[in-house]
Amino acid sequence: NSVTGTIVHTPPTHTQIEQMIEELCAFANDESTENFIHPIIKATIIHFMLAYIQPFVDGNGRTARSLFYWYLLKKGYWLTEYLSISRIIYKSKSSYEKAFIYAESDMNDISYFIHYNLNAMQKSYDQLKQWLQRQALKRQAAQTYTAIDGVNDRQGYILRLFADQPT
């Protein structure tokens, strides 16, 4: 814990890491349909496992989130590219850590972490939707000015800003 300085997770020993990484890679690249796991759940498991294994001295969280994004993009979840789940995790670091600790302390019941991650994704999707709605409103407001011959979208937006703040 970065606030209290207490150790909240002890990763596997260095002798276990290589095998665990090999198993994680096999899991991430397994394309069989025999035991279907929804891609969002599987991406979350990959995220959790790399963070659990902690194979690097630094950057395990960033790498785990990168693998999460990679897997979803690989599976066709293109909107993931525009999500900022890292921002959500940063804003709720305590909840992220609790989900991880609960999963580890409750006989490795990863459902805590999956639940947290699904909520983080929902918040991120909601933020993206709100941003897109704001951009659409800006564009719509600028269209009044883009109707003027020779004025492009960006110029129309700037003219609208001036019109909204006349001083």
Report each predicted region and the residues it spans:
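FIC/Doc superfamily catalytic core
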Residues: 1-167
